Swiss-Prot record:
One Pfam family it belongs to: Retrotran_gag_4
Natural source organism: Saccharomyces cerevisiae (strain ATCC 204508 / S288c) (Baker's yeast)
Protein's UniProt name: Putative uncharacterized protein YCL076W
Top-level taxonomic group: Eukaryota
Length: 247
């Protein structure tokens, strides 16, 4: 059974919830909250039109074409309406550095901004959370106490979602090991840059790796400190000798 497309009804159905569609969507700012953001986008798209989620993920409407036997003009109309809805939704819910990346995509679009191009970029680059992005989020933990309570709640929701779901392939023991390693790093802010450089691009982490890395750095810093202390002592001795000769 095929249906007849009513363009006015479709436009009204899709665009009427546009003004408040972003209210319940967690803003996308980093890979840490990509899955939460995507869930919100999919929910809003489903609410706007039952066929829109296919367009979100593929840029096409094969199911709707089949059910409505759409003409080429009707297909183009539907895609334009869906695209407009999603681009506006993305612009409202993508923030921070992620928004800068989206703006680059929009600037390169030469006119018509493609919702699918925006989605594809973040699906490819934000879908896998790295140790670096998780660590960046956890590093904000000491600073969050001064924020309003709703921001604290939102931050903690994002944090614990990330900790619980930091790698779907990992078993429970490995996830726990990774999370303990991440939390350990927050107690050593002096090694922040070194942690990001060493482990930032990794997808998983072993606690033993971090402990070994910390011990090696501690040993290196200790040797450096001893060397610096000896140089400083020599300098003080030299200055004392020099002062005695300048009476």
């Amino acid at each position: 059974m095929t249906y007849k497309l009513d363009r006015n009804s479709l436009r009204q159905q899709v665009m009427s919830p546009q003004s408040n569609a972003s209210e319940n969507i967690i803003n996308l700012s980093s890979p840490n909250n990509y899955k939460q953001w995507l869930y919100g986008i999919e929910t809003a798209a489903e609410y706007a039109n039952e066929y829109m989620n296919e367009f979100v993920h593929t840029g096409d409407i094969q199911s709707m074409k089949r059910d409505y036997n759409l003409s080429a003009n009707d297909e183009s109309f539907v895609k334009t309406v869906f695209n407009s809805f999603l681009v506006k939704l993305y612009k409202k819910t993508i923030v921070g550095e992620a928004a800068c990346e989206m703006n680059w995509i929009c600037d390169d679009s030469l006119g018509r901004v493609s919702a699918y191009d925006i989605f594809s970029h973040f699906e490819e680059n934000y879908n896998e959370v790295t140790i670096g992005s998780r660590l960046t989020l956890i590093e904000d933990l000491p600073n969050i106490s001064s924020k309003p309570v709703d921001e604290i709640a939102s931050f903690l929701k994002t944090l614990f979602t990330m900790l619980e779901d930091n790698s779907e392939e990992q078993d429970k023991k490995k996830r726990r090991d990774t999370n303990i390693a991440l939390l350990l790093m927050t107690f050593l802010p002096e090694l922040k840059e070194s942690f990001h450089e060493k482990f930032g691009d990794s997808k998983a982490l072993q606690l033993s790796q971090v402990i070994r890395f910390c011990k090696l750095n501690a040993s290196s810093n200790s040797s450096s400190s001893v060397s610096d202390a000896l140089v400083a002592q020599d300098r003080r001795n030299y200055q004392k000798k020099g002062n005695k000769g300048c009476i």
